Amino acid sequence: EAVGIAGVILAAGIDKIEVPLNSPSPFDSINTIVEAYGDQALIGAGTVLTTAQVKQVRSAGGQLVVSPNCDPAVIAATIAEGMQSWPGVFTPSEALAALQAGATGLKLFPGDMAGPKGLKAMRAILPLGTQVYAVGGAAPDNFSKWIEASADGFGLGSAIYKPGDTSETVAAKAQAIVTAFDAI
Protein backbone atom coordinates (compact mmCIF):
# COMPACT_ATOMS: atom_id res chain seq x y z
CA GLU A 1 0.00 0.00 0.00
CA ALA A 2 2.77 2.47 0.91
CA VAL A 3 4.37 2.45 -2.54
CA GLY A 4 1.04 2.95 -4.32
CA ILE A 5 0.05 5.81 -2.04
CA ALA A 6 3.47 7.45 -2.39
CA GLY A 7 3.28 7.08 -6.16
CA VAL A 8 0.03 9.01 -6.51
CA ILE A 9 1.26 11.70 -4.12
CA LEU A 10 4.40 12.14 -6.23
CA ALA A 11 2.39 12.10 -9.46
CA ALA A 12 0.38 15.06 -8.15
CA GLY A 13 3.60 17.03 -7.68
CA ILE A 14 4.30 16.64 -3.96
CA ASP A 15 7.96 15.68 -3.50
CA LYS A 16 8.38 15.31 0.27
CA ILE A 17 6.88 12.26 1.95
CA GLU A 18 6.98 11.43 5.64
CA VAL A 19 5.78 8.14 7.05
CA PRO A 20 4.58 8.62 10.64
CA LEU A 21 6.36 6.32 13.05
CA ASN A 22 3.05 5.67 14.79
CA SER A 23 1.79 3.90 11.65
CA PRO A 24 2.05 0.12 11.08
CA SER A 25 5.55 -1.08 10.02
CA PRO A 26 6.85 2.44 9.33
CA PHE A 27 10.47 1.48 8.67
CA ASP A 28 9.42 -1.16 6.13
CA SER A 29 7.20 1.44 4.46
CA ILE A 30 10.04 3.97 4.33
CA ASN A 31 12.37 1.38 2.85
CA THR A 32 9.95 0.29 0.13
CA ILE A 33 9.09 3.89 -0.79
CA VAL A 34 12.80 4.80 -0.95
CA GLU A 35 13.48 1.79 -3.19
CA ALA A 36 10.68 2.83 -5.54
CA TYR A 37 10.98 6.62 -5.47
CA GLY A 38 14.13 7.62 -3.59
CA ASP A 39 15.53 9.38 -6.65
CA GLN A 40 12.33 11.42 -7.13
CA ALA A 41 11.47 12.62 -3.63
CA LEU A 42 12.69 13.41 -0.15
CA ILE A 43 11.41 10.50 1.93
CA GLY A 44 11.57 9.93 5.64
CA ALA A 45 9.68 9.74 8.89
CA GLY A 46 7.42 11.82 11.06
CA THR A 47 6.72 11.60 14.78
CA VAL A 48 10.42 10.91 15.40
CA LEU A 49 11.02 11.26 19.14
CA THR A 50 14.34 9.55 19.91
CA THR A 51 17.89 9.29 18.61
CA ALA A 52 17.38 5.53 18.25
CA GLN A 53 14.49 6.21 15.86
CA VAL A 54 16.73 8.58 13.90
CA LYS A 55 19.17 5.72 13.31
CA GLN A 56 16.31 3.44 12.26
CA VAL A 57 15.07 6.03 9.74
CA ARG A 58 18.57 6.26 8.28
CA SER A 59 18.89 2.47 8.14
CA ALA A 60 15.61 2.34 6.21
CA GLY A 61 17.05 4.79 3.66
CA GLY A 62 15.22 7.87 4.86
CA GLN A 63 16.59 11.38 4.30
CA LEU A 64 14.00 13.34 6.28
CA VAL A 65 13.20 13.44 10.01
CA VAL A 66 10.15 15.37 11.22
CA SER A 67 9.35 15.61 14.92
CA PRO A 68 6.40 17.02 16.85
CA ASN A 69 8.77 18.59 19.37
CA CYS A 70 12.13 20.35 19.64
CA ASP A 71 14.70 17.91 21.03
CA PRO A 72 18.27 19.13 20.39
CA ALA A 73 19.62 15.56 20.72
CA VAL A 74 17.28 14.31 17.98
CA ILE A 75 18.16 17.28 15.77
CA ALA A 76 21.91 16.74 16.25
CA ALA A 77 21.62 12.99 15.61
CA THR A 78 19.62 13.64 12.44
CA ILE A 79 22.17 16.09 11.07
CA ALA A 80 25.03 13.74 12.05
CA GLU A 81 23.34 11.02 9.98
CA GLY A 82 23.21 13.37 6.97
CA MET A 83 19.44 13.80 6.96
CA GLN A 84 17.18 16.84 7.04
CA SER A 85 15.76 17.75 10.47
CA TRP A 86 12.39 19.49 10.78
CA PRO A 87 11.50 19.71 14.49
CA GLY A 88 8.17 20.91 15.77
CA VAL A 89 8.23 24.33 17.40
CA PHE A 90 5.53 26.56 18.84
CA THR A 91 7.40 29.39 20.53
CA PRO A 92 10.23 31.69 19.48
CA SER A 93 12.44 30.07 22.15
CA GLU A 94 11.84 26.61 20.69
CA ALA A 95 12.43 27.90 17.16
CA LEU A 96 15.76 29.47 18.05
CA ALA A 97 16.83 26.41 20.07
CA ALA A 98 16.02 24.17 17.09
CA LEU A 99 18.04 26.33 14.72
CA GLN A 100 20.95 26.50 17.17
CA ALA A 101 20.91 22.68 17.32
CA GLY A 102 21.22 22.57 13.52
CA ALA A 103 17.64 22.11 12.27
CA THR A 104 17.20 22.26 8.50
CA GLY A 105 13.84 23.99 8.88
CA LEU A 106 10.99 24.36 11.32
CA LYS A 107 7.60 22.69 11.64
CA LEU A 108 5.21 25.20 13.25
CA PHE A 109 3.01 22.85 15.27
CA PRO A 110 0.18 22.91 16.03
CA GLY A 111 -0.32 25.43 13.29
CA ASP A 112 -3.99 25.97 13.96
CA MET A 113 -3.17 27.20 17.48
CA ALA A 114 -0.42 29.58 16.34
CA GLY A 115 -2.28 30.64 13.23
CA PRO A 116 -0.87 32.75 10.42
CA LYS A 117 -0.63 35.73 12.79
CA GLY A 118 1.58 33.71 15.13
CA LEU A 119 3.88 32.76 12.26
CA LYS A 120 4.07 36.35 11.04
CA ALA A 121 5.04 37.53 14.54
CA MET A 122 7.63 34.78 14.93
CA ARG A 123 9.28 35.75 11.63
CA ALA A 124 10.49 38.96 13.29
CA ILE A 125 13.04 37.00 15.33
CA LEU A 126 13.94 34.19 12.93
CA PRO A 127 17.12 34.39 10.86
CA LEU A 128 16.51 35.44 7.27
CA GLY A 129 16.01 32.40 5.06
CA THR A 130 14.65 30.11 7.78
CA GLN A 131 12.21 27.66 6.22
CA VAL A 132 8.97 27.26 8.20
CA TYR A 133 6.22 24.78 7.35
CA ALA A 134 2.77 25.11 8.94
CA VAL A 135 1.52 21.76 10.22
CA GLY A 136 -1.81 21.02 11.83
CA GLY A 137 -4.53 23.28 10.53
CA ALA A 138 -3.13 24.16 7.11
CA ALA A 139 -5.51 23.20 4.31
CA PRO A 140 -6.36 24.31 0.78
CA ASP A 141 -8.98 26.73 2.07
CA ASN A 142 -6.42 28.67 4.13
CA PHE A 143 -3.17 28.21 2.19
CA SER A 144 -3.28 31.83 1.01
CA LYS A 145 -3.43 33.16 4.60
CA TRP A 146 -0.42 31.03 5.54
CA ILE A 147 1.54 32.12 2.45
CA GLU A 148 0.74 35.78 3.22
CA ALA A 149 2.17 35.15 6.71
CA SER A 150 5.36 33.75 5.08
CA ALA A 151 4.87 29.98 5.41
CA ASP A 152 7.27 28.18 3.08
CA GLY A 153 5.17 25.03 2.90
CA PHE A 154 2.78 22.74 4.69
CA GLY A 155 2.59 19.37 6.39
CA LEU A 156 -0.76 17.89 5.53
CA GLY A 157 -1.10 14.50 7.23
CA SER A 158 -4.70 13.35 7.31
CA ALA A 159 -5.71 16.00 4.76
CA ILE A 160 -3.96 13.85 2.17
CA TYR A 161 -4.09 10.32 3.62
CA LYS A 162 -6.11 8.48 6.24
CA PRO A 163 -5.77 4.74 6.91
CA GLY A 164 -8.09 2.91 4.56
CA ASP A 165 -7.96 5.53 1.80
CA THR A 166 -7.57 4.06 -1.67
CA SER A 167 -4.91 5.25 -4.10
CA GLU A 168 -7.67 6.91 -6.10
CA THR A 169 -8.90 8.84 -3.06
CA VAL A 170 -5.38 9.95 -2.17
CA ALA A 171 -4.69 10.93 -5.78
CA ALA A 172 -7.79 13.15 -5.81
CA LYS A 173 -6.88 14.75 -2.47
CA ALA A 174 -3.27 15.31 -3.53
CA GLN A 175 -4.30 16.87 -6.84
CA ALA A 176 -6.78 19.18 -5.11
CA ILE A 177 -4.07 20.27 -2.66
CA VAL A 178 -1.57 20.98 -5.43
CA THR A 179 -4.19 22.82 -7.50
CA ALA A 180 -5.09 25.01 -4.50
CA PHE A 181 -1.43 25.72 -3.76
CA ASP A 182 -0.63 26.55 -7.39
CA ALA A 183 -3.59 28.96 -7.53
CA ILE A 184 -1.99 31.24 -4.94
Predicted region positions:
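Catalytic cores of alpha/beta
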Residues: I5, T50-A60, S93-A101, A124, ...
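Glycine-rich beta-to-alpha transition loops that act as phosphate-gripper elements at the mouths
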Residues: S23, I43-T51, S67-D71, P87-P92, ...
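Conserved N-terminal beta1-alpha1 strand-loop-helix module at the mouth
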Residues: E1-Q63, A80, A139-D141, K162-I184
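Conserved functional loop/turn residues at catalytic and ligand-binding sites
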Residues: G13, Y37, G61, N69, ...
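Glycine-rich phosphate-binding active-site loops on the catalytic face of alpha/beta enzymes
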Residues: L64, P68-V74, L108-G115, A149-K173
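Histidine/lysine/aspartate-rich catalytic loop segments that bind and position anionic ligands
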Residues: L64, P68-A114
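CoA-thioester-processing core
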Residues: S85, P116-L126, V132
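Structural preference for beta-strand elements that scaffold enzyme active sites
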Residues: K16-E18, Q40-G44, Q63-L64, Q84-W86, ...
